[in-house]
Structure formats: structure tokens, C-alpha cells
From Swiss-Prot:
Subunit structure: Component of the small ribosomal subunit. Mature ribosomes consist of a small (40S) and a large (60S) subunit. The 40S subunit contains about 33 different proteins and 1 molecule of RNA (18S). The 60S subunit contains about 49 different proteins and 3 molecules of RNA (25S, 5.8S and 5S).
GO cellular component, one term: cytosolic small ribosomal subunit
GO molecular function: structural constituent of ribosome
Name of a matching Pfam family: Ribosomal_S3Ae
Cellular localization per UniProt: Cytoplasm
Keywords from the UniProt entry: Cytoplasm, Ribonucleoprotein, Ribosomal protein
Family to which the UniProt record says this protein belongs: Belongs to the eukaryotic ribosomal protein eS1 family.
Amino acid composition bias (Basic residues), ranges on this chain: 1-19
Name under which the protein is recorded: Small ribosomal subunit protein eS1A
GO biological process, one term: translation
Length: 264
């Protein structure tokens, strides 16, 4: 009786052409993500990437990555009051083990926006697109809520449509006037330190009494041609990545015993 092939029995004479499997983490490197100089905490995150091999360059893979951080972690002097805002950065240049980033967007958390909603008031929203002095086009989403006037007897505080249009026009003019004269670095400082929103409240309160006015979202929709000198001036003194050097030493120490075993 002829026996058929048993697929469960592997042939002992056949060997794999591949060598010993290399550990995945041995092919990777750690990098520090650095925020611009107008934030207190510069190195706010770490990321990992494969080492440069042949035509696949690690710097090209890292450029364009977007990282998100909490504003309270970036500006620790502000405390937990700024924990409701998230700031995103995009990598533009790789310098050693440091990733130099630029502002990408900012957004208010969903739970904070839900806490601002009330009954018996008017919610006003407007969108403003402005171009900074150095060529960045930013789109701002502003939301405002009315409040009752002093000695008001009525329960609600609804606003008339003509006042809402007037308020939107004033917000648009003021944002364009303030942000079109500054560069992206100063514009981010005005947004993150509530300088612009406080100025908007002071200018809009004579039209309508406002309970809250927030810039709920900011996006960079268009960027100018990459300028390395402008990026370096925005970062100023870049902190040294001491931990990256320590990691290289640890990798060398771990690789030494493995090389000795292979030689034996």
C-alpha cells in the first residue's frame, strides 16, 4: 500500500535560508519631541523610529508626525486651569535626537464645551481666517454665550439678530487686526495665554453682556515654504538630549555579551 505525504511531518534536512531573527527594538531609536520656545516645558514627549537603512532615512519618516499635549503640562505655571485645552505640534526638522516642531492646532476638550452650554441664552459662533506676517494661514472658531443684564426681570437672555451680526463683525475685525501683524510665534502666545480672548471680551461686552467667550479651536490650514532659519529662531536654545546618549551606552553594554556568546 502506497503511503501519501504527511504534511504534519516536517523534513529534517530542509533548513531555513534566513538567519537568526533580530530583536525588533534593536532596529529602532528614541527621539525627544521639542516644543517652540514660547512654551515652558520644551521636551514634552518621546517617540520611536526605525534606524536609517539604505534609502529609508529616519529623518524623512519623522517629518510630518503630529504630537498632542495638554496645555497645562506645557505651561506648568498656569496650573490645572488650562487643562481643558489640547495643543498639537507637527515635526518640521530633525536635529540629532531632537525633533523640532511647529504649532499645528489647538482645541478645547469636549467635556469643557459641554459644561459651557446653558438654557435660556443665545449661543453665537463665528469662523475667522487670518494670515500672519510670516505667511501662516490660521482658522479660528470662536463661540460666545450671552448672560442676563443687570436688574433684568426676564428669565431668558436671548440676543437680537442685529446685535449678533454686530458682535460677529467686531470679533472678525479684531482678530484680523491683531494676528495679521505678528508672526506665528507671537500669535500662539496670544492664543495660549488668553490675551486675545480677554481683549475680545472687553470689546464685545458693550454690545452684549457675555457670560463666556472662548476660542474653541485653532487650525493652521496653510503654511509657507519651509525656512530652517525661522524655525531655529522660534526654538531659540534647544535643550540637550542627555537621555539619548545614555540609551546609546546601554545598547552598547547589552550588545557586548551577545557578541561574546556568538564568538564562542
Amino acid at each position: 500500500m502506497a503511503l501519501g505525504k504527511n504534511k504534519r511531518i516536517s523534513k529534517g534536512g530542509k533548513r531555513s535560508k534566513r538567519g537568526k531573527a533580530q530583536e525588533t527594538m534593536a532596529r529602532k531609536e528614541w527621539y525627544d519631541v521639542v516644543a517652540p520656545a514660547n512654551f515652558e516645558k520644551r521636551q514634552f514627549a518621546k517617540t520611536i523610529c526605525n534606524k536609517t537603512q539604505g534609502t529609508r532615512i529616519a529623518a524623512d519618516v519623522l517629518r510630518g508626525r503630529v504630537f498632542e499635549a495638554n496645555l497645562a503640562d506645557l505651561n506648568q505655571s498656569a496650573g490645572e486651569e488650562e487643562a481643558y485645552r489640547k495643543v498639537r505640534f507637527t515635526v518640521q526638522e530633525v536635529q540629532g535626537r531632537n525633533l523640532l516642531t511647529q504649532f499645528h492646532s489647538m482645541e478645547v476638550t469636549t467635556d469643557k464645551m459641554a459644561s459651557l452650554l446653558r438654557k435660556w441664552c443665545t449661543t453665537m459662533e463665528t469662523t475667522v481666517e487670518v494670515k500672519t506676517a510670516d505667511g501662516y494661514t490660521m482658522r479660528l472658531f470662536v463661540v460666545a454665550f450671552t448672560k442676563p443684564q443687570a436688574n433684568q426681570q426676564s428669565r431668558n437672555c436671548y440676543a437680537k439678530q442685529r446685535l449678533v451680526k454686530w458682535l460677529r463683525m467686531r470679533i472678525t475685525k479684531m482678530i484680523k487686526r491683531r494676528l495679521s501683524k505678528v508672526q506665528i510665534k507671537e500669535a500662539v502666545s496670544l492664543l495660549t495665554r488668553n490675551v486675545l480672548s480677554d481683549a475680545l471680551v472687553r470689546r464685545c461686552n458693550p454690545i452684549l453682556p457675555l457670560r463666556e467667550l472662548r476660542i474653541r479651536k485653532v487650525r493652521v490650514v496653510r503654511t509657507p515654504k519651509f525656512d530652517a532659519q525661522a524655525l531655529l529662531s522660534a526654538h531659540g536654545t534647544i535643550p540637550a538630549s542627555v537621555e539619548a546618549d545614555q540609551r546609546e551606552v546601554e545598547e552598547a553594554v547589552e550588545a557586548a555579551p551577545a557578541a561574546e556568546k556568538a564568538a564562542e
